């Protein structure tokens, strides 16, 4: 028997066992869709599988370091009203960087003040020396010797730096002026080595032994970058904003038209036409500005009071004008020198740094003018009676009035009487405009205090108010007027026959100020003639009196309160008037005490918000209350010599 056969079908063969290998997903083919039938629409192909995108080569941008000059230029453009987006686009910086510059502006200004010079504006990092005192001492010593033509080399400067270190920190100081310190000192102050052929001056002492460094060529000395080897005094090359002019003028700072028109008794009138009793109220004002009028320095007021009561316990740096004392109220040589180094040089350097200009300037100063009655005297050789003290004294030489590096200096204009005479630019209308504006504001104050007598106003108007009034009047002088006066003054040296430009505008402005003065004088003094107002305006046009040409005249004593008219008596009449209609009326002493308390509070506030008008009005009320009540003067309402 045979076994049963399997069912019909494919033959089954044994398959050997194999391990199943996992197939990669990337090789797996997507399932195919069935072929579309005759009545179906075609479907779009599926999107590509997600995967890594191809890399694109990106060029890296390098960060750019901006100098302090660039940062300050951007800051000035934003402060000038330009949009920050436009400034960022021009400089190629994001908005956050520009806002950071604006935030760091005080630090940038402080760094320039510490470093100084044109080199400081080119710095990109605000880093000072580790030993700042030694660095400053060496740099000042270097500038002083280079001004006198003394050649200096690296080893000499290094030895002097170590000597300064021992003087500052004591003999135990371990400071060493290495070659690295000297290299950093050169780069910090912009000093390079140059070969000098012939110095301007020989050294005062014997020639110091000079030992050259290997890096320096034989005969090379150190000079500041951009400066000639001999530092000549007439190097020129100044821009319009770097040329300044200063001029002095006399001013009766609280003299009103009524007092000026009152004739003096006997020979109590000085040649200018004013009574001698008001000579103590005469001050000298120094005005200075650059050619464009964009920088006007604070006026300098010189008076005869050594310690004015109204200026005590006050920070005079906040005043719009400065005050200095002189026995005869004239600009002497020490005063001019002190003003030049204490106010002019720091103010000009701050302005030049703010404007991103080179740190150099020149100040043109006219010789002190003499009144017509003094200049008409015969010279000393022809008249032995002319005192020597009436001869005008020179205020100094250009060598004395200049900075150690010679960047800021003074030049005196010619004083000849022929064509060689160069008039001061500010004499052509600027000084007269300042005085007319000052007297207009003075009359406005007098009209506002018309409730009291003129003596009440003069006692209430103190020297502190005068400084504010002088600063206000100087600010009212337009920059365009100053620039036109410069052109008019300098044209005399080149085109003496040509007419001044913009004469119509100047005449219209002058006429408007004179019209205001005449109107205010008519309001304050109804019986005053226009000729008397004109005399009051031109009373101090002589420009001031030079040294020694004044007589020592003591200020007039103020009238006693008993001699002044009073409508309210003291004693029993005041007690009878204390009660009127059941309302308690304060006494004169209580009223004066309350007004003085209010005055002390008002003076403690910000002077720019208060202004001189309210202070003068309140002092006028106090003076009137004291006069009506028969009370003597007090220390609160100081009269500054009235």
Curated annotation (Swiss-Prot):
Which subcellular locations apply to this protein?
A: Nucleus
Q: Which residues form the DDE-1 domain?
A: 240-365
**Composition skew (Pro residues), residue ranges:** 31-53
- Please list the residue ranges annotated as the HTH CENPB-type domain: 122-195
* Cellular component GO terms, alphabetical: nucleus
Q: What segment(s) does the record annotate as region Disordered?
A: 1-54, 202-238, 375-400, 548-581
Fetch the InterPro entries from UniProt.
CenT-Element_Derived (IPR050863), DDE_SF_endonuclease_dom (IPR004875), Homeodomain-like_sf (IPR009057), HTH_CenpB_DNA-bd_dom (IPR006600), HTH_Psq (IPR007889), WH-like_DNA-bd_sf (IPR036388)
Q: Does the keyword S-adenosyl-L-methionine apply?
A: no
Pfam families in the cross-refs:
CENP-B_N, DDE_1, HTH_Tnp_Tc5
PANTHER family, A to Z? TIGGER TRANSPOSABLE ELEMENT-DERIVED PROTEIN 5 (PTHR19303:SF56), TRANSPOSON (PTHR19303)
Q: Which family does it belong to?
A: Belongs to the tigger transposable element derived protein family.
Q: What is this protein called?
A: Tigger transposable element derived 5
Which source organism? Mus musculus
